[in-house]
Amino acid sequence: MYAIELFMKNQQAQPEPVRYPATTLFRDKDGKVLEWEITSITSAENDEIRMACSKARSGMTKKELENSFDVSLYNAKLAAACTTEPNLRNVKLQDSYGVKCAEDLLRKMLPLPGEYDRYVQKVQETCGFGEQFAQDVETVKN
């Protein structure tokens, strides 16, 4: 058995940010592809995003609530919340793309569907969601 002290908050390691080349469309002055930084969010933050993506109405059953979950919106909000570089909440950056929110900016900065999908998948991996999560998302979509 482990000593309970090993589980105390001050012993808890913080997840390391992940660097990821989300797209080849942005390069530095030497032509090197810029890497984006992804940082995991907390379970509480994830719950807030999930709630924002569910359209609950009074009288809905649990099954109806599950069916009202907007997976696409969830993926966009999760990816935007976990992206720490570039800063998707930067007003100047948003203005340059003509958008007003981080989720829309992310879609504009990753205009190729494959790049966007791979980025969302990398964000999910960074947050600890494995293959089962991806399968669950597909099940909800269908």
Can you name each region flagged by the protein language model?
Residues 30-142:
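Short, surface-exposed, charged amphipathic helix/loop patches that serve as local interaction elements
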